[in-house]
Swiss-Prot record:
Keywords: Aminoacyl-tRNA synthetase, ATP-binding, Cytoplasm, Ligase, Metal-binding, Nucleotide-binding, Protein biosynthesis, Zinc
Species whose genome carries this gene: Leptospira borgpetersenii serovar Hardjo-bovis (strain JB197)
Example GO molecular function: ATP binding
Amino-acid positions noted as binding Zn(2+) in the UniProt annotation, renumbered to this chain: 889, 892, 906, 909
Full protein name: Isoleucine--tRNA ligase
Domain notes: IleRS has two distinct active sites: one for aminoacylation and one for editing. The misactivated valine is translocated from the active site to the editing site, which sterically excludes the correctly activated isoleucine. The single editing site contains two valyl binding pockets, one specific for each substrate (Val-AMP or Val-tRNA(Ile)).
Taxon lineage: Bacteria, Pseudomonadati, Spirochaetota, Spirochaetia, Leptospirales
Length: 914
């Protein structure tokens, strides 16, 4: 016999919780085994098969670059998507998401070139493409492993890669459809250009950083006037060799001003004072000059033997400068537009690597940024530099090289944004999309309203070639529907390598001739498609078509994708379908360190989701952290926040452990019908029903942080602090098969099952672990959210809540007695409770229920002559803690009125042990 049994011979008769479910989760070690089980049993496929024919919910996965391991931002994104898919499936939907990877483009090509090091010169284009494909394939595998380790569900044989032949063929096909409909054209326009990478950049590939530029005021001599000049201001001296005009605004008032050196300068009246303050040159107004007079002016280029003309444009403002704008149509969007209207061809004497060409022989071969000081000195030597300073401003940089970009006019392929009112149609369609958070619509509208034509072409090796040919006889570009369809079929069979491996004649339909001269000899183009076009047409390649509605129910990405993937997906879909590709768009913020700084290698503040979280805490802790966030805003994370989440997880796990322990020996077949349950149990099942309803609603609106908060409250307060405490005596000391104990066991079973299913989208491993620990054979993910609305009983809740209002007063009174050393356990107390409203507690709940509610041995509305140990009251209740006249039952520790002498069992315990 144990020491405990010697001390208390009844301990073996008490039904204490018993379970093999460990308190220590050991998630990092045990989760991989569960991942293997899910894969072997094809749980994700079974989830979909089980929901076949149900209402469909499709989340389209924006493809990450197959470049490097997943960082914490990726983990946030993928876990959010997985949580949504699981919650939608449990809500009864046929929920689906096919994970994808972006495999072409600069990020991969640049990394491969970097890895080659000195061998780069020995590597030809064909070998480079093979290395890029191999590199992308490697990281698809690594990131796929990361995805599984985040406990995300996906079928490994059911993914999309933008470098697969089928996908590449779809890219070419969609490009062809857009070309056929007139949305694609070739033209020479200024585009963002990386002189480090020698390629064009789209709007989505640009990042803005602080940059210091020269700030100069330059005098353009007026033809026919000896001492009269037009004053311009620029921060890009290197573009002056390409100047073809000076632009004014007809709505701005201009005048001729005289300097102390008797020179005359034309500039805007409203900016004269600013010019004087900046340059230190005093200006005296001589006379106004009209728009007609300005239009007649011609200007001598400051250092090139060329005449510049006068133009007018609304882009000229009074925000800075002189109101007279240096205009180089080959190096600026606005410059290009006004130049085009005036018949000026864009002129850009700069090559792919940012060096001046022989069109500016004075500095041929010089890099443009390096030329700035020389151009400034040239102006100074000619007496045409009024002022030279510096300006720090936000300047466009390449997202890949982090180096400044230039605007440069080159022949490129473009998507025509304003063709057939596409911009207006898209703006109208945006209004019909659900944007979460709501400010997303304002952000994307502002971008769509001002977006220039999309530059589709790139001058790189790794990507889908634009199927355009050049006639070797007359130089005409050849591209038509027949040639695109022919090439699409070839790509579908053999991949894009066919473009490089086959002879040009074999890439075109037989008997293809030049539409201009009739020649049949062509050469291939060298441009590839923007990688944003690849991902932008993924909804055509991956998703099934739906009649008159978008193919995706939801897009979910970081808020930076308003200018990226959300737009690159929108334009082709609007052009070809007439509708957006998505019904709703949900965005999340950036992951920052605990000080609100971006994570970077230089700061050393990065948190690796695998090494720093999963291998330390487990993936369920990572998922719980994600669920705790209001992710619509930027998110701060550090060791302290992860520690807090880990502690909250322990409380949730402890709740599950207590439930499982108390259900030892209980089977669902022993559950009582709901209507036969005790009132206390029905009250807490009503509370459960309310919690479930709220949680399901929060899943529906993607407000997972609300579920997290309510789950913690439900587990720690509603259950652990209240309900478990109230039924402990019943569960431990009642007869195992008594109706009272079965009532509570039934409630605990319902609570366990409901909580388990409810948290499964978030705590995927733990939910499955609890589910199987309770003897369930199938997966928790093959269930549906419980519908407990019929259990919701407001009148019952009102009745209990009235009684529970006294619990705070009771607990305070008990605490006073403990502090004074008069009381140990609450079961050593009896209570006198008086409602100041005159309401009798007996009218609300039976005395036995109140004793459970307050976890005391006896309840009295009037003291039957017991010693008062303490008292407390508020405006509603007065409570006295009494010392029971009876002794303590050695089995249940209660002091009940049926105990006749010290050491006797109470009547209930006598019947149990008999």
């Amino acid at each position: 016999m144990s020491e405990t049994q010697k001390e208390n011979p009844y301990s073996s008769t008490v039904l204490l919780p018993k379970t093999d479910f460990p308190m220590k989760a050991d998630l990092a070690k045990r989760e991989p085994e569960q991942i293997r089980s899910w894969k072997q049993n094809r749980i994700f496929r079974k989830m979909r098969e089980q929901r076949s024919g149900k209402k469909e919910f499709v989340l389209h996965d924006g493809p990450p670059y197959a470049n490097g391991n997943f960082h914490l931002g990726h983990a946030l994104n993928k876990i959010l998507k997985d949580t949504i898919i699981k919650s939608k499936s449990l809500a009864g939907f046929y929920a689906d998401m096919i994970p994808g990877w972006d495999c072409h483009g600069l990020p991969i090509e640049v990394q491969v070139l970097k890895n080659l090091g000195k061998k780069v010169r020995e590597t030809g284009p064909e070998e480079l493409r093979q290395l890029c494909r191999k590199y992308a394939e490697e990281f698809v595998g690594k990131q796929g492993d990361d995805l599984s380790r985040f406990l995300c569900f996906w079928d490994e044989g059911r993914i999309y890669k933008t470098m697969s032949p089928d996908f590449e063929a779809k890219i070419v096909e969609v490009f062809g459809e857009l070309f056929k409909k007139g949305y694609v054209y070739r033209g020479k326009k200024p585009v963002y250009w990386s002189i480090d990478l020698a390629t064009a950049h789209a709007e989505a590939e640009i990042e803005y950083y602080p940059h210091i530029s020269p700030s100069i005021y330059v005098k353009f001599p007026i033809i026919g006037e000896k001492k009269r000049f037009c004053l311009i201001w620029t921060t890009t001296p290197w573009t002056l060799p390409a100047n073809l005009a000076i632009c004014f605004n007809r709505k701005i008032e201009y005048s001729i001003f005289k300097t102390e050196s008797s020179e005359e300068l034309i500039l805007a009246d409203a900016l004269a004072e600013n010019v004087t303050i900046t340059t230190g040159v005093a200006l005296t107004k001589l006379k106004p000059i009209t728009s007609e007079e300005l239009a007649a002016l011609k200007f001598q280029h400051p250092f090139v033997d060329r005449i510049s003309v006068s133009l007018f444009g609304d882009h000229v403002t009074l925000e800075a400068g002189t109101g007279c704008v240096h205009t180089a149509p080959g190096h600026g969007q606005d410059d290009y537009k006004v130049g085009l209207a005036a018949g000026l061809e864009p002129f850009s004497p700069v090559d792919d690597y940012g060096r001046y060409t022989d069109e500016f022989p004075l500095m041929q071969g010089k890099k443009v940024f390096d030329a700035n000081p020389e151009i400034i000195q040239l102006l100074r030597d000619k007496g045409l530099l009024l002022y030279h300073g510096e300006l720090e401003h936000s300047y466009p940089h390449s997202w890949r090289s982090k180096k400044p970009l230039i605007f440069r006019a080159t022949p490129q392929w473009f998507f025509k944004i304003d063709f057939q009112d596409l911009r207006e149609k898209s703006l109208s369609a945006i209004d019909g999309v659900r944007w979460i958070p709501s400010w997303g619509i304002t952000r994307i509208r502002s971008m769509v309203e001002t977006r220039p034509d999309w530059c589709l072409s790139r001058q790189r090796n790794w990507g889908v070639p634009i199927p355009a040919f050049t006639c070797e006889s007359c130089g005409q570009t050849h591209i038509d529907d027949a040639s695109i369809q022919f090439f699409t079929k070839m790509v579908r069979e053999k991949g894009i390598e066919i473009w490089y491996s086959e002879e040009t004649k074999d890439l075109l339909p037989p008997k293809t001739k030049c539409g201009k001269c009739g020649n049949d000899s062509f050469k291939k183009g060298n441009d590839i498609l923007d990688v944003w076009f690849d991902s932008g047409v993924s909804n055509f390649s991956v998703l099934g078509e739906r009649k008159d509605e978008p193919p995706a129910d939801l897009y979910l990405e970081g808020s930076d994708q308003h200018r990226g993937w959300f737009q690159s997906s929108l334009w082709p879909s609007m052009a070809l379908r007439g509708i957006p590709p998505y019904k709703a768009v949900l965005t999340h913020g950036y992951v920052l360190d605990e000080k609100g700084r971006a994570m970077s290698k230089s700061l050393g503040n990065g948190i690796d989701p695998t090494a720093d979280i999963i291998q330390v805490y487990g993936a369920d802790i990572l998922r719980l952290w994600v669920s705790s966030l209001d992710f619509r805003d930027d998110i701060k994370v550090g060791k302290e926040s992860l520690k807090i989440v880990s502690e909250q997880y322990r409380k949730i796990r402890n709740t599950f452990r207590y439930l499982l322990g108390n259900l030892d020996g209980h089977t669902p077949e022993q559950n009582l019908p709901f209507e036969e349950l005790e009132e206390l149990d029905r009250f807490y099942l009503s509370k459960l029903a309310g919690f479930v309803e709220d949680a399901v609603a929060s899943y529906e609106t993607y407000q997972f942080h609300q579920i997290y908060q309510k789950l913690i409250l439900f587990c720690t307060v509603t259950l652990s602090q209240d309900y478990f405490d109230m039924i402990r005596d019943r569960m431990y000391c009642d007869l195992r098969d008594s109706k009272s104990r079965r009532s509570s066991s039934t409630a605990l079973q319902y609570i366990l099952d409901s909580l388990c299913i409810l948290v499964a989208p978030i705590l995927s491993f733990t939910a499955e672990e609890v589910w199987t620990s309770n003897g369930k054979k199938d997966s928790v993910f093959l269930q549906t959210f419980p519908d407990l609305k019929s259990w919701k009983n407001q009148s019952l809740e009102d009745k209990f809540e009235s009684a529970l209002q006294a619990r705070e007063v009771v607990q305070k009174a008990l605490e006073i007695a403990r502090q004074e050393g008069k009381l140990g356990k609450s079961l050593e107390a009896a209570l006198e409770i008086v409602s100041k409203s005159g309401l009798s507690f007996g009218e609300l709940l039976p005395k036995e229920t109140l004793e459970l509610l307050f976890v005391v041995s006896q309840i009295h509305e009037e003291n039957p002559g017991m010693e008062v140990l303490s008292s407390h009251e508020n405006e509603k209740f007065s409570v006295k803690v009494l010392k029971p006249l009876q002794g303590e039952c050695p089995r249940c520790w209660r002091h009940t009125e049926d105990i006749s002498k010290e050491g006797d069992l109470c009547g209930r315990c006598k019947s149990v042990v008999a």
